[in-house]
Amino acid sequence: VTIPPAPWEGEWNHTDDSRVSERNKANFKIELENVVRSLKNHPSIIQWIVFNENWGQFSTMENTQKVLDMDPNRLVTAASGFTDFEIGHIQDYHSYPYPTIGTWYPGVPTVDYPTTRRIRVVGEYGGIEYNVPGHTWYPNPSGVYDRPATSVEQLTMRFTNIAEWANAMAKQDGLSAAIYTEIADVENETNGLVTYDRKYDKINIGRIRPIIEY
């Protein structure tokens, strides 16, 4: 039985060199080197991420090795989310709403490289929207990762559920870190734990504290 590709599979399958012009490749390499060289002594930087979610991803091994050579004192992630290569210090998955280790978008290729030499993390999970009128940048934000919550109580319950899932993965699957999307609302997304203006807590902080301090 032949299963046809999903309609969007062609978009995601261009993961290494495809759809990146030679001009853009050359510009990326120049900017990559300039950014690392100019900022590598900044104390607040703890990690370099070369590519995010296949966006313009090309020559992953070469570009990541360049960063490793330029700054041997920091952690380096080759690709945050999606197409992974066995290089760098961290294997990073993106998964919504629950944290998972593997592919969550049909048609997104991943390579199951061994993780015995690398840290395994979920770099993005959660994304539960809760829109508080009067506290947003746009009147009708459009960024939605999962079905919206409608109250502080509902967001607290759903956050608790998926955060406990992440804690279980730390015990059972060797997960070293999980990053919730996101701490605060941004311009076009209301999936934060506080509003864009930082004036309204959208979640019960006291109830989630024991979970996030796990």
Which residue ranges define each predicted feature?
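Substrate-binding/catalytic cleft of secreted carbohydrate-active enzymes
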Residues: V1-I203, R207
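Long, highly charged low-complexity segments enriched in Glu/Asp and Lys/Arg with interspersed Ser/Thr
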Residues: I208-Y214
